[in-house]
């Protein structure tokens, strides 16, 4: 039995004594303890060494007091498992080769055996689960098909997604063929993560806002829904969070995927999102990460605004406090610690 199951209870919209909190990229460069591990190796080797991935996954639980751990990995391990060469060069960016721009390129991508190609993530999940010893839940994750598609077609990050959109608008059948192939791997991967011990899954659609509403409905949401529904069919008790960053005008469509919770960027008032959705889903978020550059009083004031905006909890409401995106590398860890402690104390009055 989990000693602290608040995160899972909030996702399932069950009564909680307070609002749980974790933050995206909580295992990362803002922590001196993470940097000490990272100095010994490169980023992808850290992801692929279960002992090290376990160590950095647990650091924020012990140092910051967050209510959930998220396995240390990267969304691009899926692209790599499918046969692409992935280079992650800190401060320079991400390079994937060769870029996927033809049907022949798509055909060359493999549909990997998850245990064989991504076994290191599953080993890290199992090891972390043991080390956590039921202290807090463990989150597994994946990138969404659209986001992984953009990396594959662009060959890295992009400002305007020209190659990805060119394929969408000139060769829509080809775009769907690639999205479908990636989506199948994503689904198999998250099911294996749950089998290995993940208590919840988050789907990161980091580049969601690159698409218009109609295009998001056509090229992104159906694939997210496929993955969510596959999880529901096999592991109905495992909650899924969908983080479609800055898709604030189609919240209802995202809820229609069947997810338990929706991650919000900081560009929307969480109270407005709740008013629109009712208590159909739990909400996660949504403090602007740069607030953590602020003074202690300002950090508390901004966090308080979010708790107040979400408002009083009902029998079927759920809120997980988080940032609206990942914590930045130069943040002061003491400011995150202050935020975590403040949310734990301040949120009880709303429950």
From Swiss-Prot:
Q: Where in the cell is it found?
A: Cytoplasm
EC number annotated for this UniProt entry: 4.1.1.37
Enzyme class name: lyase
Question: Quick one: which pathway?
Answer: Porphyrin-containing compound metabolism; protoporphyrin-IX biosynthesis; coproporphyrinogen-III from 5-aminolevulinate: step 4/4
Entry keyword annotation includes Cytoplasm: yes
Look up keyword Repeat and say if it applies.
no
User: What's in the keyword line of the UniProt record?
Assistant: Cytoplasm, Decarboxylase, Lyase, Porphyrin biosynthesis
List the Gene Ontology MF annotations in alphabetical order.
uroporphyrinogen decarboxylase activity
Indicate which residues the UniProt annotation says bind substrate: 25-29, 74, 151, 206, 325
UniProt subunit comment: Homodimer.
Q: What does this protein's UniProt record list under function?
A: Catalyzes the decarboxylation of four acetate groups of uroporphyrinogen-III to yield coproporphyrinogen-III.
Family indicated by similarity:
Belongs to the uroporphyrinogen decarboxylase family.
Instruction: Write down what this protein is called.
Output: Uroporphyrinogen decarboxylase
Which species does this protein come from?
A: Pelodictyon phaeoclathratiforme (strain DSM 5477 / BU-1)
Gene of this entry:
hemE
